[in-house]
């Protein structure tokens, strides 16, 4: 077996890993966007050229030189004899799936149905982007007419509204049956790999996260993706049970089931994430802490509350919905977020809101002219359901509402009265800024809060620096203590740390069992 | 274990920064709302800061009993003890 860490080895994100057996059959583990590398060359208004996107990314060494790309984007061939059986997508975060659009549509995408739902919701509520394209039309070569119009012949162009354009039909595969509502083709997971293969969900900050295990030659190989552990105390488990219910408690227990399934798999090579092993943290927040701190803030104000968290972080949605219910407030989602919720409910009935929960959900009617695909569907559905809320209704009763609104949504608050915004509360309940751009965004965001005298929680400015406090966020990644316990109990034969800045942490504990090379041959 | 003076010193610094008052105003006898001008949200924010700084959990029921800076110092001292 050969393990090639193509990206995401000594950095956080951008995972691209290939596993190849002795017969040159192989598979890929994630195909994410490496934000730090991307930021070295590109920013919001400086991007690779869509008409030569793979040429550009290959030249900048942002994607590996493998025969895995869509033929409408790239017609080159590399000296690489590997047959790619599938690409496993561990979870729908861009640093793991953000370049999946480039992949040859004939290579099946293996993931949970929830991950597919979140990816679809993300793609179909945003402007089209080749990097994340899941379906639609393939690009085409330039025509004579294009040449006449001065377009260079080595570029590819958008097919526009052409009815003759070739469809981009993805092959997708799931560990359990999923009802599709797009034109992807489903491939039986059992047919993907010549040996044993299983995908088991893990608990992470996005619904649908999963790990994979496959038999490769005479070894078992397992890949965790990103994960955190579930409730570690009886008190925390009680919180889940009381707040979210028995069925949803299962969400938090997914990680332990994944590792339980690996116990009898020997010899075992474990590719494992180590995001937090560098961080010095004296506080280990849980979802229960987030709930309790949010309750304090909600009880402390009669003003409008704005909460910032990604809706695909489903237990956070449940947490704030519950807090709203306890405080007789309606949770107001943007149409785009409502689209996410509908997609997730469609794929996994377990996540469906109860009638009581649903009665506390509203959808904001933003001052937008253009709605994209699923976002438009969600808006129209909210109108049909009678839960579409105008800014005026929030102005009338700010004490009855909590808006889910982040940085990109803030222009929409300009429709609210200044009196309502003055003294309103903003709760930052998501991760901190990691990149320089995000820090600039955060600084800009503080201007909004200051201008309207909105009281921030979870984020503050100290001597001109933005500080993210942790009261409203529980990390989606396993703690160093949790990881050490898991690895000691599992006792894998080989450990391959990825998604970490501190591989030495693993070497200190498991020494010669830790494999650090970019290419590992076993 | 931190002494009462050490706890008071940290509490004073947090209150001063959070409420924008001079440290000399933050005496053990000073009332958070009446003397230092804290509102209900300031209290929530302060409590979370104390929890983070001292690694203690402030029970919501106990919060109602806290009126002065000295009450906070005593509460933290007891929790740490």
UniProtKB/Swiss-Prot annotation, chain B:
Subcellular localization: Cytoplasm
Gene Ontology BP, a term: lipid A biosynthetic process
Database matches in PROSITE patterns: CARRIER (PS50075), PHOSPHOPANTETHEINE (PS00012)
Record InterPro entries: ACP (IPR003231), ACP-like_sf (IPR036736), PP-bd_ACP (IPR009081), Ppantetheine_attach_site (IPR006162)
GO cellular component terms attached to this protein's record: cytosol; membrane
Post-translational modification: 4'-phosphopantetheine is transferred from CoA to a specific serine of apo-ACP by AcpS. This modification is essential for activity because fatty acids are bound in thioester linkage to the sulfhydryl of the prosthetic group.
Lipid metabolism is among the record's keywords: yes
Gene3D superfamilies: ACP-like (1.10.1200.10)
Chief site of localization: cytoplasm
Location of O-(pantetheine 4'-phosphoryl)serine modifications: 40
Keyword Protease found: no
SUPFAM superfamilies recorded: ACP-like (SSF47336)
Membrane-traversing stretches: none
Coiled coil: none
GO molecular-function term, one example from the UniProt record: acyl binding
Pathway where this protein functions: Lipid metabolism; fatty acid biosynthesis
Protein family (similarity comment): Belongs to the acyl carrier protein (ACP) family.
Role, per record: Carrier of the growing fatty acid chain in fatty acid biosynthesis.
PANTHER family (UniProt xref): ACYL CARRIER PROTEIN, CARRIER DOMAIN-CONTAINING PROTEIN
Name of this chain's protein: Acyl carrier protein
The species this protein was found in: Thermotoga maritima (strain ATCC 43589 / DSM 3109 / JCM 10099 / NBRC 100826 / MSB8)
Phylogenetic placement of the source organism: Bacteria, Thermotogati, Thermotogota, Thermotogae, Thermotogales
Protein's gene: acpP
């Amino acid at each position: 077996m050969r393990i090639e860490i193509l990206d995401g080895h000594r950095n956080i994100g951008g995972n691209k890993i290939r596993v190849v057996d002795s017969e040159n059959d192989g598979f890929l583990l994630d195909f994410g966007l490496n934000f730090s590398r991307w930021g070295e060359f590109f920013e919001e208004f400086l991007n690779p050229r869509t008409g030569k996107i793979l040429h550009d990314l290959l030249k900048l060494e942002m994607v590996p030189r493998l025969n895995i790309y869509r033929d409408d984007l790239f017609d080159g061939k590399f000296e690489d004899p590997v047959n790619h059986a599938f690409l496993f997508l561990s979870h729908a975060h861009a640093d793991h799936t953000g370049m999946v659009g480039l992949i040859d549509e004939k290579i099946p995408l293996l993931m949970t149905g929830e991950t597919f739902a979140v990816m679809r919701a993300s793609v179909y509520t945003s402007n089209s982007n080749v990097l994340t394209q899941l379906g639609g039309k393939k690009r085409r070569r330039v025509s004579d007419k294009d040449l006449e119009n001065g377009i260079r012949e080595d570029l590819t162009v958008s097919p526009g509204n052409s009815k003759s354009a070739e469809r981009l039909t993805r092959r997708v595969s799931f560990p359990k049956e999923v009802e599709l509502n797009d034109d992807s083709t489903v491939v039986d997971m059992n047919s993907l790999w010549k040996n044993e293969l299983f995908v088991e969900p893990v608990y992470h900050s996005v619904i649908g996260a999963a790990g994979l295990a496959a038999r490769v030659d005479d070894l078992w190989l397992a890949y965790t993706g990103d994960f955190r552990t579930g409730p570690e105390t009886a008190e925390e488990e009680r919180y889940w049970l009381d707040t979210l219910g028995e069925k949803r408690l299962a969400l938090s227990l997914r990680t332990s089931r994944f590792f339980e399934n690996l116990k009898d798999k020997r010899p075992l090579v474990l590719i494992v994430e180590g995001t937090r092993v560098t961080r010095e943290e004296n506080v280990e927040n849980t979802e229960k802490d987030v709930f309790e701190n949010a309750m304090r803030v909600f009880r402390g104000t009669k003003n409008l509350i704005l909460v910032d968290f990604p809706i695909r972080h489903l237990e956070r949605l449940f947490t704030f919905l519950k807090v709203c219910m306890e405080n007789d407030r309606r949770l107001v989602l943007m149409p785009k977020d409502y689209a996410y919720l509908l997609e997730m409910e469609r794929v996994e009935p377990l996540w469906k809101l109860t009638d009581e929960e649903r009665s506390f959900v509203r959808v904001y009617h933003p001052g937008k002219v253009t709605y994209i695909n699923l976002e438009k569907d969600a808006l129209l559905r909210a109108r049909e359901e009678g839960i579409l809320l105008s800014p005026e209704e929030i102005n009338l009763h700010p004490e009855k509402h909590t808006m889910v609104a982040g940085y990109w949504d803030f222009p929409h608050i300009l429709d609210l009265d200044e009196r309502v915004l003055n003294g309103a509360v903003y709760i930052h309940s998501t991760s901190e800024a990691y990149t320089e751009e995000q820090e600039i965004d955060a600084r800009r965001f503080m201007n909004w809060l200051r201008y309207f005298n909105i009281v921030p929680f979870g984020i503050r400015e100290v001597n001109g620096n933005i500080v993210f406090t942790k009261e409203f966020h529980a990390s989606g990644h396993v703690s160093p203590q949790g990881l050490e316990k898991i690895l000691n109990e599992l006792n894998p034969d080989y450990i391959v740390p990825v998604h970490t800045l501190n591989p030495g942490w693993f070497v200190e504990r498991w020494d010669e069992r830790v494999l650090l090379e970019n290419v590992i041959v076993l | 274990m931190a002494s009462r003076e050490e706890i008071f010193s940290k509490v004073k610094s947090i209150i001063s920064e959070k409420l924008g008052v001079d440290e000399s105003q933050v005496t053990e006898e000073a009332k958070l709302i009446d003397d230092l001008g804290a509102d209900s949200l300031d209290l929530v924010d302060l409590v979370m800061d104390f929890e983070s700084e001292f690694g203690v959990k402030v029970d919501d029921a106990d919060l109602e009993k806290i009126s002065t800076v000295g009450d906070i110092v005593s509460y933290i001292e007891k929790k740490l003890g």
